[in-house]
C-alpha cells in the first residue's frame, strides 16, 4: 500500500507547480517558536507526527468485506493511491486536534483512523476510532465510515453518531439535512470527510446537530438543554474516549494513545476541573423567576434542575480521579506477540 501511494505521491509532486507541491519533509521542531505554546506544540508534533500514517502491524481483527475485485480497475487503484497520498501528508496534527491513519497491510480499500477531538468541545482531547472502507464503485460512491468508539454499542455521542457506529454526514450520503455538501466523484476526498467529522460533528454544542433543534438557539430553554446534552457527552467522552482508550487501546493506535495523553495530561485535567466548576455553579444557581410561559417551555425560563448538575459533578469528579490514576501510572508493557502455532503432527507411517 505504501509503495503504491509513494509512487502516486512522486508523480503528483512532479506534475504540480512548485508553489503547490506537497511538502514531504517534516517541519523542523521549534520553527514557530515565537508563537504562544510553541514548545508544547513542537514537542507534540515531534512525538506524534511520525505516527500519523503507517501500515497496521496486525489487521486480523478488522471486519472486511470481500475484495473490491480480483483485479481492480487501474483507475480505481490510481484514485485509491491518491487518497493515500492525501491522507499521509495532510492529516491535521496539532495539540488542539489531530488524526492518525493505519492501512490494512494487503488491502488498499481498508483504513482505520483515530481522531483526537477539538478543544472547546465536550469531546476535547478524546480519541475516537473509525473504520473506513472504499466500495468497488468508488469514487462514484463515497467511502463508508463506521465509528468504533461507541461504548461497546451503548453510547450515542452525537445526533450524527449512532450506537451502531453509523456516521451521518452529507458527504457520505448518510444525512440529508439542509445545506450539507454532497459527495462529488471528481473533487471530494476522504481527507475532506475526516476534516468534516472534526469540524461539523465534534462541535461545542452537539445538541443543535439534531435537525430542527437549531430553532432553540439563544433561548433559555435551548441553552439549558444544550448544556445538559453536552454534559452527558462529556461524561461519555471521559469514560470511553479517554479512560477506555488508555486501558484498552486499539492495537494499531496503542503508541498514539499513550503519547497523545502523555502530552495532553495537564490540559485534560484542567478542562475537567473547569467542567466540574461549571457544574458546581449550575447546581448552586437559584431558580430563575420570570413571568410569561411556563418553565421549560419555548419562550419561558429554563428548567431548574440542581439534582442533574449535582449528579454530573459527582460523576465527573469520580471519572477525573480514575483518569488521573491512569495518566500518572507508568506505561504498561506492550503485549507479547502471540506464539506461533505448533507444527502439525506427522502422519503415521
Mark where each language-model region is.
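UBC/E2-like fold recognition across ubiquitin and ubiquitin-like conjugation systems
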Residues: 1-125, 137-349
Amino acid at each position: 500500500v505504501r509503495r503504491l501511494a509513494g509512487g502516486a505521491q512522486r508523480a503528483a509532486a512532479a506534475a504540480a507547480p512548485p508553489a503547490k507541491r506537497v511538502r514531504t519533509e517534516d517541519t523542523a521542531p521549534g520553527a514557530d517558536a515565537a508563537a504562544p505554546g510553541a514548545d508544547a506544540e513542537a514537542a507534540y508534533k515531534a512525538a506524534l507526527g511520525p505516527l500519523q500514517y503507517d501500515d497496521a502491524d496486525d489487521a486480523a481483527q478488522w471486519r472486511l468485506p470481500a475484495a473490491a475485485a480480483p483485479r481492480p480497475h487501474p483507475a480505481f487503484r490510481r484514485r485509491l493511491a491518491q487518497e493515500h497520498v492525501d491522507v499521509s501528508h495532510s492529516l491535521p496534527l496539532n495539540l488542539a486536534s489531530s488524526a492518525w491513519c493505519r492501512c490494512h497491510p494487503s488491502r488498499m480499500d481498508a483504513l482505520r483512523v483515530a481522531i483526537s477531538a477539538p478543544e472547546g468541545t465536550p469531546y476535547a482531547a478524546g480519541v475516537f476510532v473509525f473504520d473506513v472502507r472504499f466500495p468497488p464503485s468508488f469514487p462514484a460512491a463515497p467511502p463508508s465510515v463506521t465509528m468504533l468508539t461507541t461504548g461497546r454499542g451503548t453510547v450515542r455521542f452525537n445526533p450524527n453518531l449512532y450506537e451502531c457506529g453509523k456516521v451521518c454526514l452529507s458527504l457520505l450520503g448518510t444525512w440529508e439535512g439542509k445545506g450539507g455538501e454532497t459527495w462529488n466523484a471528481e473533487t471530494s476526498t476522504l481527507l475532506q470527510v475526516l476534516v468534516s467529522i472534526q469540524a461539523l460533528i465534534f462541535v461545542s454544542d452537539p445538541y443543535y446537530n439534531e435537525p430542527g433543534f437549531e430553532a432553540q438557539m439563544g433561548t433559555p430553554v435551548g441553552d439549558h438543554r444544550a448544556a445538559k446534552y453536552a454534559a452527558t457527552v462529556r461524561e461519555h467522552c471521559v469514560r470511553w474516549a479517554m479512560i477506555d482508550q488508555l486501558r484498552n487501546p486499539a492495537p494499531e493506535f496503542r503508541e498514539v494513545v499513550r503519547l497523545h495523553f502523555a502530552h495532553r495530561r495537564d490540559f485534560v485535567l484542567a478542562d475537567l476541573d473547569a467542567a466540574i466548576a461549571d457544574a458546581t455553579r449550575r447546581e448552586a444557581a437559584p431558580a430563575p423567576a420570570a413571568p410569561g410561559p411556563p418553565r421549560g417551555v419555548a419562550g419561558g425560563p429554563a428548567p431548574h434542575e440542581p439534582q442533574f448538575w449535582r449528579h454530573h459533578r459527582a460523576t465527573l469528579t469520580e471519572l477525573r480521579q480514575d483518569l488521573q490514576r491512569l495518566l500518572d501510572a507508568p506505561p504498561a508493557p506492550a503485549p507479547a506477540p502471540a506464539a506461533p502455532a505448533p507444527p502439525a503432527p506427522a502422519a503415521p507411517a
